[in-house]
């Protein structure tokens, strides 16, 4: 529309200049410049909003500076930094690998090859191709497995990816489905407007008007009809909504997600950190067939000591300035050890067991990092002169790999009865909503890989509590009121998951809970048939998550899926709204997601859904305001044309009206705050567009009322003179459209919404009325705008007629909602 409007304005200016109307020509060109400035400012504002959101979702990095592990924004990395790479990280700089632990990287963004590439810290001789540099990693690549330390060699545009980017033009921002839908509507509307203008032009010629007057009349109609602010208003309202969401910890990565949020009908949420506080605290330790509190451990007991070795050394987290860095579960194990340190410092010193001493003196020889398929993590150390593999992980997985058990009397073969007893203890912990890890070790000279993770000696269990967030139960209840089905998906034990889900209201009597194994035994049709009854999924794999999403989608639902790991990326991509965790999430999951929760909180998703619904509602109301106002202008011009009456508006009038009403008032409507009723409605059908039959009827009805008020003023003025008629019609159409902004704030009466609840609407109205008053009351502007001086009586009639459409529309709203 912007390009079309510019062409029409240039034509209007040319006609005015050709006819000798210098003042009109200057005004039209001035409006053209103002429109261009406003359009540019709107575009710049929208672009800055999107850029700021991209900054919020940019990856961070873990570095070692002065021997201390730190987390910093990736933009602060410089050559010479040592960066720690872990599975799920996005590599943000080029670098040379110093130490590699089974590191595998996806370099498809650079090489185009999707297969994972194994990396090494070995020296490579000679000048080799980029794809063969096994001891180098590159910006834009993803760590898919393992861990490493790298020395940064290049950042920004100096990286290999940066060099490629420098050769390319920036990709054009893709439009959202709503914008594309409006573009199609705008194209059809433009054709319709041109046809109407052609018909009106022919009617004017038929009525023996001059060629210039006929062209001016047709141009005036085109200017009145074109909602030139439509596209920019939609973009700005969406950008404003995303900024508001970002302040509430929901970072939207693309505008398409804003539209989809209002349609979400199912939220598949992880448990840990999202529904719970992610503040793990060790509760009890089961070791040597007894329960202990952490401070009851006997550090001179070899079994207890080896359990602590496993908890502290087989651990990638750290504590810097009393702040945990790394996985919260591993951080809880370090916190447990620190509590023991505080209580038993002298014994620890005697046993040489202080955390800092352990970590400094014990060098990690090998490791197999944790992954969601194995559900284990293993590392190899030299303990008391013997190479020892330390392993921790899920009880049901690790217990099956244990052949021995360590007790006070030493090591002996493990019986099935002992395994059953441990499983029973795990069950009891889980029923109380506790998370349980098992620990085992073996002394071995063999190289550590996944094939070595057998023949272990069992040490014990550590149970941890991760209490539900205080707001989780209320957020779950709110989601159900909003017609959204909450579903818990977790890697935890089924009993633990059900206990937490029941406490916060996700799991109710009659609901089903499935494990990943049970899910694998079901066909797709069986899953689709039963999925509405399943509230909890436990011990699931990434493939299971994709099946769950697809089953809900086949039933016509819009699905949101949360995730934080590398393997969650496919499910996040598959979901209609992929949600990554900002605190615990890997960069791979953030890259795949549409939205990032900077607080990892389920309640934030519900707030984002409410904001998404509000953005869509505000866009719909802003479009109604623009189109109903322009409809009024079209109907007024058509009425006088068909009735053989003088032209009610000049192009300058209509340009002024559009400039006044299509900018600030429309933006103010787009900033209407959300209300509690948004989460009492059912999710919107994504297949239902804005321009529904009901919307069109409302638009035409409101346009008719405004046009009728304007034409009534026109006839009152016509009794005096055609100049008075034009002036009264112009003032009434302008003022009634400004009043109409209050009608379009919502579907309910302004008395229920509150006149002052949206201060932007008041500011826009005051600005519009002030500018209209300047035109009417400053004599020097009368000739420029081709208007007559108005007597007091006429001013009263204009105000009364301008208010009439708003009064009638408000009465209709009150009757409808009673």
Regions found by a protein language model. Name each.
Residues 1-680, 690-691, 704, 715, ...:
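Conserved cytosolic headpiece of P-type ATPases
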Residues 709:
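C-terminal catalytic subdomain
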Residues 744:
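Hydrophobic, aromatic-rich cap/lid helix
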Residues 684-703, 723-724:
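Membrane-water interface at loop-to-transmembrane-helix junctions
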Residues 661, 706, 727-741:
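Generic alpha-helical transmembrane segments
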């Amino acid at each position: 529309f912007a390009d079309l409007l510019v062409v029409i304005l240039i034509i209007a200016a040319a006609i005015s200049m050709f006819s000798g109307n210098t003042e009109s020509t200057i005004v039209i060109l001035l409006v053209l410049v103002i429109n261009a400035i406003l359009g540019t400012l709107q575009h710049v504002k929208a672009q800055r909003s999107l850029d700021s959101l991209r900054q919020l979702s940019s990856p961070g990095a873990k570095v070692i500076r002065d021997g201390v592990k730190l987390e910093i924004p990736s933009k602060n990395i410089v050559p010479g930094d040592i960066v720690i790479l872990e599975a799920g990280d996005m590599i943000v700089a080029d670098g040379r690998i110093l130490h590699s632990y089974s590191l595998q990287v996806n370099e498809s963004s650079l090489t185009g090859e999707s297969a994972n590439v194994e990396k090494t810290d070995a020296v490579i001789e000679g000048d080799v191709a980029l794809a063969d540099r096994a001891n180098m990693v590159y910006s834009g690549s993803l760590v898919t497995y393992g861990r490493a330390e790298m020395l940064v060699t290049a950042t920004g545009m100096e990286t290999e990816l940066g060099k490629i980017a420098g050769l390319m033009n920036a990709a054009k921002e893709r439009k959202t489905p709503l914008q594309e839908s409006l573009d199609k509507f705008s194209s059809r509307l433009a054709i319709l407007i041109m046809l109407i203008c052609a018909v009106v032009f022919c009617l004017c010629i038929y009525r023996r008007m001059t060629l210039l007057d006929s062209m001016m009349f047709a141009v005036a109609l085109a200017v009145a009809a074109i909602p030139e602010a439509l596209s920019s208003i939609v973009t700005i309202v969406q950008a404003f909504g995303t900024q508001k969401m970002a302040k509430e910890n929901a970072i939207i990565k693309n505008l398409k997600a804003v539209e989809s949020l209002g349609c979400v009908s199912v939220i598949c949420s992880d448990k840990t950190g999202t529904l719970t506080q992610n503040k793990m605290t060790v509760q009890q330790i089961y070791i040597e067939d007894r329960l202990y509190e952490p401070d009851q451990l006997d550090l001179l007991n070899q079994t207890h000591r080896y359990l602590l070795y496993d908890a502290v050394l087989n651990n990638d987290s750290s504590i810097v300035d009393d702040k945990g860095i790394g996985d919260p579960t591993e951080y809880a194990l370090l916190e447990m050890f620190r509590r023991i340190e505080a209580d038993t410092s002298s014994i620890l010193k005697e046993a040489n067991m202080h955390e800092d001493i352990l970590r400094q003196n014990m060098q990690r020889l090998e490791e197999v990092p944790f992954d969601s398929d194995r559900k284990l993590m293993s590392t190899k150390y030299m303990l008391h002169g013997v190479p020892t593999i330390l392993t921790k992980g899920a009880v049901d997985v690790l217990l099956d790999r244990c052949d021995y058990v360590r007790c006070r009397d030493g090591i002996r073969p493990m019986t099935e009865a002992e395994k059953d007893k441990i499983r029973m203890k795990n069950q009891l912990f889980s029923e109380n909503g506790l998370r349980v890890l098992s620990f085992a070790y073996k002394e071995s000279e063999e190289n550590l890989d996944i094939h070595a993770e057998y023949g272990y000696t069992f040490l014990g269990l550590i149970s941890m509590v991760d209490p539900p967030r205080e707001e989780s139960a209320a957020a779950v209840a709110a989601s159900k009121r909003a017609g959204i089905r909450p579903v818990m998906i977790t890697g935890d034990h089924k009993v633990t998951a059900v206990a937490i889900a029941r406490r916060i209201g996700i799991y109710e009597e009659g609901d089903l809970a499935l494990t990943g194994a049970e899910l694998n035994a079901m066909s797709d049709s069986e899953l689709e048939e039963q999925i509405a009854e399943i509230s909890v999924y436990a011990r699931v794999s990434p493939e299971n998550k994709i099946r769950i999403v697809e089953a809900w989608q086949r039933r016509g639902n819009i699905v949101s899926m949360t995730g934080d790991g590398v393997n969650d990326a496919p499910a996040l991509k598959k979901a209609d709204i992929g949600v990554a965790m900002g605190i615990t999430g890997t960069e791979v999951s953030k890259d795949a997601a549409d939205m990032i929760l900077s607080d990892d909180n389920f309640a934030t998703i519900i707030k984002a859904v409410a904001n998404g619904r509000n953005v869509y509602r505000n866009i719909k109301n802003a479009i109604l305001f623009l189109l109903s106002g322009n409809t009024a202008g079209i109907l007024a011009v058509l009425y006088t044309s068909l009735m053989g009456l003088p032209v009610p508006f000049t192009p300058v009038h209509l340009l002024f009206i559009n400039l006044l009403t299509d900018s600030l008032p429309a933006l103010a409507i787009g900033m209407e705050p959300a209300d509690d009723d948004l989460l009492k409605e059912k999710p919107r059908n994504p297949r239902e567009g804005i321009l529904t039959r009901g919307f069109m009827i409302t638009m035409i009805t409101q346009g008719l009322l405004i046009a009728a008020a304007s034409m009534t003023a026109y006839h009152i003025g016509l009794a005096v003179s055609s100049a008075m008629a034009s002036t009264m019609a112009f003032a009434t159409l302008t003022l009634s459209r400004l009043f109409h902004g209050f009608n379009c704030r919502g579907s309910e009466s302004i008395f229920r919404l509150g006149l002052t609840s949206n201060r932007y609407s008041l500011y826009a109205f005051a600005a519009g009325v002030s500018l209209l008053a300047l035109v009417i009351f400053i004599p020097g502007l009368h000739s420029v705008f081709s208007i007559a001086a108005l007597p007091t009586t006429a001013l009263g009639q204009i105000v009364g007629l301008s208010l009439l459409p708003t009064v009638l529309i408000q009465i209709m709203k009150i009757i409808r909602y009673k």
